[in-house]
Amino acid sequence: MLLSAVGDALGYRNEQWEYCESGEQIHSELEGLGGLGNIHVCLPHWPVSDDTVLHLASAQALNTGKDGDALLHEFAAQYVEAMKDMKGRKPGPTSILGTSQLRPGEPLGFQIPFNPKGVGCGAAMRSMCIGLRYPRPEQLPHLVRVSIDSGRMTHNHPTGYLG
């Protein structure tokens, strides 16, 4: 997870590279910074993006040891709390909408309505740690279920939560 966060901070570059579609431009700017070996990933110039903040929220939910609906309520609570740490970050509109609809603690408060536009990759960006909780082959059904259910909390469209 640490290396994921470092890679995210590098790729994000304080909002400058997140949406840059030109690899040549990024490589040129990286060279202008003295190359990768001269980069010191630290605040304030190299923050992590919203993806890492939400990935950490996923890990915190999983770390509670809860299962079933209790775990899903924990995911919802962690995502809602994580959205309070978005200053200087660019969460996507699907993540913003989805988390605004979560009601952790309320019956089925971890479910949001289907979103025909919820096709981004945010759900995938924060789900890597789920495999750490369910690493064994016999746990595969749990891994898939928790991955889908946590993804649907913001990206409730098959393209979004299966991304």
Residue ranges: model-predicted function:
Residues 1-163:
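Structured, active/binding-site neighborhoods that engage oxygen-rich ligands
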